[in-house]
Amino acid sequence: MQVILLDKVANLGSLGDQVNVKAGYARNFLVPQGKAVPATKKNVEFFETRRAELEAKVADVLAAAHARAEKINALGTVTLASKSGDEGKLFGSIGTRDIADAVTAAGVEVAKSEVRLPNGVLRTTGEHEVDFQVHSEVFAKLTVNIVAEA
């Protein structure tokens, strides 16, 4: 099925590309998410007339993502308190939701889906590097300091 992409899609293309995808992928994911429209003659003409407007919208979203990434990087360190044992092992773990809530409380709005923990949840006290994927092209880093709760 031929579709026109309205946004950058990983491993597929960027705004304005006409790509051939499986019908189910287009029908169940790309079209409902607003990332693509079927490549009919009417849609191709409509897209070409609105191309500049859509490119400006994508540029605005990207600029907002860069601004949020700068705010996250500017925070430097966020401290979380959690119950732990004598050797610094936590009772439980610190996951994406806990980190997202702490960063949001520090003043930068972050969704838990934007937090990247490549090594899984955090289970020890100390400082940990955490990545944030604010946009498909924009990443930020933050240090999370986990301290033992008194």
Curated annotation (Swiss-Prot):
Function: Binds to the 23S rRNA.
Biological process, per Gene Ontology: translation
Family the entry assigns: Belongs to the bacterial ribosomal protein bL9 family.
Matching NCBIfam families: L9
GO annotation, cellular component aspect: ribonucleoprotein complex; ribosome
Protein's name in the database: Large ribosomal subunit protein bL9
Pfam families for this protein: Ribosomal_L9_C (PF03948), Ribosomal_L9_N (PF01281)
SUPFAM superfamilies assigned to the protein according to its UniProt record, in alphabetical order: L9 N-domain-like, Ribosomal protein L9 C-domain
Molecular functions (GO terms): rRNA binding; structural constituent of ribosome
The encoding gene: rplI
Organism this protein belongs to: Erwinia tasmaniensis (strain DSM 17950 / CFBP 7177 / CIP 109463 / NCPPB 4357 / Et1/99)
Keyword Flavoprotein in record: no
Keywords, sorted A to Z: Ribonucleoprotein, Ribosomal protein, RNA-binding, rRNA-binding
Highest taxon of the lineage: Bacteria
